[in-house]
Amino acid sequence: MASSSTSLKRREQPISRDGDQLIVTPLGAGSEVGRSCVYMSFRGKNILFDCGIHPAYSGMAALPYFDEIDPSSIDVLLITHFHIDHAASLPYFLEKTTFNGRVFMTHATKAIYKLLLTDYVKVSKVSVEDMLFDEQDINKSMDKIEVIDFHQTVEVNGIKFWCYTAGHVLGAAMFMVDIAGVRILYTGDYSREEDRHLRAAELPQFSPDICIIESTSGVQLHQSRHIREKRFTDVIHSTVAQGGRVLIPAFALGRAQELLLILDEYWANHPDLHNIPIYYASPLAKKCMAVYQTYILSMNDRIRNQFANSNPFVFKHISPLNSIDDFNDVGPSVVMATPGGLQSGLSRQLFDSWCSDKKNACIIPGYMVEGTLAKTIINEPKEVTLMNGLTAPLNMQVHYISFSAHADYAQTSTFLKELMPPNIILVHGEANEMMRLKQKLLTEFPDGNTKIMTPKNCESVEMYFNSEKLAKTIGRLAEKTPDVGDTVSGILVKKGFTYQIMAPDELHVFSQLSTATVTQRITIPFVGAFGVIKHRLEKIFESVEFSTDEESGLPALKVHERVTVKQESEKHISLQWSSDPISDMVSDSIVALILNISREVPKIVMEEEDAVKSEEENGKKVEKVIYALLVSLFGDVKLGENGKLVIRVDGNVAQLDKESGEVESEHSGLKERVRVAFERIQSAVKPIPLSAS
């Protein structure tokens, strides 16, 4: 492991009540070990880490506190490894709640998950009413689980995440989540010590803003692996030498494989033990070993090097044992049996049969959850209650030799000092052990800049983060570095919490979006001469091209290469253009102009009284037309408090008096453009009257 002198650079995130709120709530494993499930919410995104059950409870009482959340709001559920206390409520959550998000775990975890949970359903001694799920639910859940490779980055609804090797068991992962630039590391169960078949947990290359970390071992320090292995083999050798039997209760997968590797090697080196059988007693024995034989390349160099000659998980001195009926209990033997907590199954049956004989021994090889028989017998009570309800003396020797693949204090403190997270949340530990760990860790970070929190179940931790919004130019826009004051024009594309600016024609290249052109076409009643329209348009617009329609032979105009004005018949004019903001404004002004020309004809025959009234109304409409035409030419046109029109172009301002036509502006170029444009508009919308007054 790297020393603390090589620690990562801490990410300094400004935190205040004004920032975005991030919430972390343990729904399980808060000041306890069991039913790991941690809820996290930030900027409208919701994540669940793990989905386990409590081994000491049954039925609904074993579940995490799912009623504290809305399952339908969860975007992503990340499972760190296959152990019951981290994955066993997943079938229930997927099939019995409103959850419709996505679920991820590693390949090895998914392979073992189904085996382990199918066995869990079979060996559980609970009533039908207390059954949380059945094999059908497990099979359905398999269809919904997606797999992720180590170091593969996945993005779901703006949530980015990837995983690192965690040690602990085959396929175990630590997940790093990134939401809007805020990073959260969830370790799950991890170990920084390489053992006989697993790599040590990796150190992420990024320092997270928050580290949610297990605290199972508290402030305890593990013995060295060699000392533990020697104690383990010495107890077994001495027990069988005096004719006793050795029971090793263990989970079907995980530490069991590590211990089997030790036993097989020890038996190979001691010919005097070859007549004493070793059994791996689990209904899953053969299937489990097949999985381990498949995922050799996911293990450490030691195993992979051995695999070049032979598969190390094809044991020479260990036989599978599927049930108690297949066991010939005569003479000394070593049996590794499931489940590890001695709640039921083969391990409990053998314990009940052997516990009264002082020649026998029981080795507890790892951490045991409160409330289980395995945890109880570590304290060596005089009597135990058997499965049939009777009591029996506990005469067999009980040895606690921890092969727990959980980080001890030395590993945890070193890992955190290398990682340097400003916020640490402790989970997955007994309350007292967790508090001792917190106090000791505070001495490792005396600067006071590190917050360490120990929330209980359903107790939320709230933090606030200010995240900047940055837009990156990509594609053609990124080829040239703009100078200060330059304008960069493009389309802003938001995906999740990232922003990119790109050229419109590169939208399909750098995003999953595609472009489409909307062609607009309208027909307007018009009975006048087409030449009048041409004359008026040329007065207003700088670019008006005349042509003849090839099919009909009727005249047509192209205004600013955007809008086509065509005579459809003696009574109709059509406009056609590809829709965009500028073309839409040009077409609006042309429509207004044509309608205004159409309205001039009735004025010739109006009576004088009606003509005066019409002129007043027409005057208002003319003002609207003038305004629309100015907007189409200059864009930003507003009516000022003094009654003058205020026109802004590229930071320059001009004021236009609608009555006199006078223009005021410090920018001579803009002043002249506005004056000429207004004169052209005036001549187009206020022509010489056809009737003499």
Swiss-Prot record:
The keyword Nuclease applies. Component of the CPSF complex, at least composed of CPSF160, CPSF100, CPSF73-I, CPSF73-II, CPSF30, FY and FIPS5. Interacts with CLPS3, CPSF100, CPSF160 and FY. It comes from Arabidopsis thaliana. It comes from the Eukaryota. Belongs to the metallo-beta-lactamase superfamily. RNA-metabolizing metallo-beta-lactamase-like family. INTS11 subfamily. It is found in: Nucleus. Pfam families: Beta-Casp, CPSF73-100_C, Lactamase_B_6, RMMBL. CPSF73-I and CPSF73-II are not functionally redundant, but both are essential in plant development. Knockdown or overexpression of CPSF73-I are lethal. Highly expressed in carpels. Also detected in seedlings, roots, stems, leaves, flowers and siliques. GO terms for biological process: mRNA processing; snRNA processing. Its EC number is 3.1.27.-. Disulfide bonds: none annotated. The keyword Nucleus applies. CDD domains: CPSF3-like_MBL-fold. Keywords: Hydrolase, mRNA processing, Nuclease, Nucleus. Its main location: nucleus. GO terms for cellular component: nucleus. Component of the cleavage and polyadenylation specificity factor (CPSF) complex that play a key role in pre-mRNA 3'-end formation, recognizing the AAUAAA signal sequence and interacting with poly(A) polymerase and other factors to bring about cleavage and poly(A) addition. May function as mRNA 3'-end-processing endonuclease and also be involved in the histone 3'-end pre-mRNA processing. The HXHXDH motif is essential for the endoribonuclease activity of the CPSF complex. A motif (HXHXDH motif) lies at residues 81-86. GO terms for molecular function: nuclease activity. This is Cleavage and polyadenylation specificity factor subunit 3-I.
